């Protein structure tokens, strides 16, 4: 499953169909920054960012173009989206409806993990309590209507990218997972039902053996917590199902071809650690969005591991190794100690609001960078075996004509739709937001009426307010 999206829905659709032809087993959608933080492509705040790091999606028209000629009942789609996850899921559902596909057949994932946004990434909009409401509304709606959908991907990836250690990535991710499970239970959901649809997202970093042990420790920890803390009895609700992406922060702008080797080693650690799905970064992603060539090479890397290495023939092939077992137990113990410390603070939301989690990550990031600067940690091509004469790589460029076309398209949607119906549906959404009703049906109604992502986000901005880090 290769993470991809850029410039426009049309061009991203072409990349998805290319990847499907090359053998990917599912799609993984990258959205641009305005989409992630609830702005339409024609908004002043979106200027300079449209299509830059992912695909811009403002309306149902964009979503239909993104999945043109892709059978949504046959392909699993992962969407890396958080603050606006409810709206993107609604757009996907309405796209399926327009293709005459039953939403009960839809398979995929929304990342929907807002806590790690406050910790590490920053694409939050609303305060934590209101964000948790949107998350649990997705849990409840999908449990009833989209049963094959994974409603959250509890993410350590970005926590590691922000500079955490392996143990901190594990602890902060599992702690956030505890908060989500408790919120779902408080909403009246049954742990043995929604627990089966939870998934995780981890980082595969440079230290090969530590990463294998980290994945094994995650599986142990989650099973123990679901069984002992939340009294789950269904084995499937105790499984730590996880996706892995190779570490983007480990890619270097210098000697970019070296990144192929880094990514291969990281991908192998994820497979040996038991990952259910995998994204291998393209070697040029330290500099730009991947080209067709680099994206294909990244895909071939994991296909060679899957089909030629032989490691996928065995469950937990590193189990029993004295080194791996000790590393696994040490990471499990260290992570549990951190989780208990967070529990004593009142849980992850309290720990986030005081800034404790962010400060712990910052300290680890500083220590790691110091070790590179002092050359204690060797990075080939950066502080060791430096080559000043390397050629410039060929990079993917953003097509500004496509960006202008995207902006014009959003303006055309707003001009040509039934704006009386749009206004009515947005007012109904605002009324729902003031109540305790599940917001998903009202969001879906807005999408059917061609309300845009930014307009829906603005309703919630007005009702919920915006979060500001202190």
Predicted regions and their residues:
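Catalytic alpha/beta active-site cores
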Residues: 1-205, 210, 229, 236-243, ...
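Generic beta-strand/beta-sheet core signal
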Residues: 1-3, 29-32, 78-82, 109-111, ...
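Short, glycine-/Ser/Thr-/acidic-enriched flexible segments
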Residues: 5-8, 32-34, 84, 115, ...
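Conserved, mostly hydrophobic/aromatic
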Residues: 23, 59, 100, 222, ...
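Phosphate/diphosphate-binding loops
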Residues: 58-61, 76, 81-84, 96-98, ...
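Structured ligand/cofactor/substrate-binding pocket environments in proteins
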Residues: 80-90, 127-133, 171-176, 206-224, ...
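Flexible glycine/proline-rich, aromatic-decorated loop/lid segments
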Residues: 190-194, 232-246, 254-281, 290-315, ...
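Flexible, glycine-rich loop/tail regions that form catalytic "lids" or insertion modules at the edges
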Residues: 292, 300-303, 307-470
């Amino acid at each position: 499953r290769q993470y991809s999206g850029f410039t426009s829905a049309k061009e991203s659709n072409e990349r998805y169909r290319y990847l499907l032809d090359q053998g990917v087993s599912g799609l993984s959608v990258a959205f641009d920054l305005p989409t992630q933080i609830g702005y339409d492509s024609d908004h002043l705040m979106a200027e300079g960012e449209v299509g830059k790091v992912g695909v811009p999606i403002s309306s149902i028209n964009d979503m239909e173009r993104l999945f043109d000629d892709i059978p949504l009942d046959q392909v699993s789609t992962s969407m890396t989206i958080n603050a606006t996850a409810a709206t993107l899921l609604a757009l996907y559902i309405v796209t399926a409806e327009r293709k005459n596909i039953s939403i009960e057949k839809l398979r995929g994932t929304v990342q929907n993990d807002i806590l790690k946004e406050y910790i590490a990434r920053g694409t939050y909009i609303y305060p934590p309590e209101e964000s948790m409401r949107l998350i649990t509304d997705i849990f409840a709606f999908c449990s009833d209507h989209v049963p094959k959908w994974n409603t959250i991907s509890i993410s350590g990836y970005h926590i590691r990218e922000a500079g955490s250690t392996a143990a901190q990535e594990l602890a902060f991710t599992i702690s956030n997972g505890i908060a989500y499970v408790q919120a779902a239970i408080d909403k009246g959901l049954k742990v043995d039902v929604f627990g089966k649809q939870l998934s995780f997202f981890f980082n595969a970093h440079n230290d090969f053996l530590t990463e294998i042990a980290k994945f094994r420790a995650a599986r142990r920890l989650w099973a123990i917590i679901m069984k002992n803390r939340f009294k789950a009895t269904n084995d499937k609700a105790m499984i730590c199902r996880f996706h892995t992406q190779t570490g983007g922060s480990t890619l270097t702008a210098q000697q970019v071809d070296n990144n192929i080797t880094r990514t291969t080693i990281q991908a192998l650690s994820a497979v040996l650690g038991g990952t259910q799905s995998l994204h291998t970064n393209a070697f040029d992603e330290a500099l730009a969005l991947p080209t067709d060539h680099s994206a294909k090479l990244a895909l071939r890397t994991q296909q060679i591991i899957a089909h030629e290495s032989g490691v996928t023939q065995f469950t937990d092939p590193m189990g029993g190794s004295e080194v791996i077992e000790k590393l696994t137990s040490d990471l499990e113990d260290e992570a549990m100690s951190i989780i208990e410390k967070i529990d004593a603070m009142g849980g992850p939301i309290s720990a986030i609001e005081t800034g404790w989690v962010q400060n712990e990550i910052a300290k680890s990031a500083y220590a790691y960078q110091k070790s590179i600067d002092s050359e204690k940690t060797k990075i080939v091509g950066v502080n060791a075996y430096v080559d000043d004469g390397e050629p410039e790589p060929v990079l993917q460029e953003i097509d500004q004509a496509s960006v202008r076309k995207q902006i014009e398209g959003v303006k055309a949607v707003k001009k040509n739709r039934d704006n009386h119906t749009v206004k009515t549906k947005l007012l109904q959404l605002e009324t729902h937001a003031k109540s305790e009703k599940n917001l998903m049906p009202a969001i879906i109604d807005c999408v059917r009426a061609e309300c845009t992502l930014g307009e829906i986000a603005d309703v919630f901005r007005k009702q919920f307010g915006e979060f500001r880090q202190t």
